[in-house]
Regions:
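Short amphipathic alpha-helix that is part of the acyltransferase structural core
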Residues: 2-33
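A conserved beta-strand-loop-helix scaffold within acyl/acetyltransferase catalytic domains
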Residues: 34-39, 45-52, 56-85
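Short acidic/polar active-site loop segments enriched in Thr and Asp
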Residues: 51, 110, 134
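Short hydrophobic beta-strand segments in globular cytosolic domains
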Residues: 62, 135-136
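Conserved beta-strand-loop-alpha-helix junction that forms the acyl-donor binding cleft
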Residues: 88, 114-124, 141-143
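Conserved GNAT acetyl-CoA-binding A-motif
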Residues: 104-116
Length: 143
């Protein structure tokens, strides 16, 4: 993808991160943080174990991922990962996930994991599997 940059956000702006969460998650039933205040966002974003990266094509924001490095469990949890609709079908999801996984493996965890569900983008699971992830557990939950 021409002019693609993926950068760690050193200054984790709660308003910007909330915007990304809302805008990207609106079609995928991301609801758990909608009621968070900016202070709650700030507290979450300032955790030392959190990494928050933004993908840009040129100067346009195209997506993001965040993960938590659970050193005590030797695990990295990709907590959110998504791209704007305008970038669907262009291969950006694969690049962004590969970046997240490479970054996560730098922590030397025993595993990297992500929750996904049937409400996610139809290609999400295929993307995870294509990058070496496996289905660990399936469960039915009512939303």
């Amino acid at each position: 993808i021409a002019n693609l940059k993926i950068e760690e956000s050193e200054k984790k702006d709660p308003q910007f991160c909330k915007f990304l969460y809302q805008k990207i998650g609106e079609d995928f039933y991301w609801k758990d943080r909608l009621a968070w205040s900016l202070k709650e966002w700030e507290n979450y974003l300032n955790q030392s174990k959190l990494k928050f990266c933004v993908a840009k094509v040129g100067e346009d924001v195209a997506g993001f991922y965040e993960y938590l490095n659970h050193e005590d469990k030797k695990e990295v949890e990709i907590s959110y990962f998504g791209i704007f609709k305008e970038y669907f079908g262009k291969g950006l999801g694969g690049y962004l996930l590969t970046h997240a996984l490479r970054s996560g493996w730098n922590h030397k965890p025993n595993r990297i994991w992500v929750h996904t569900c049937t409400l996610d983008h139809p290609h999400a699971l295929r993307n995870y599997i294509a990058r070496g992830m496996n289905i660990f557990k399936k469960e039915k939950v009512r939303v």
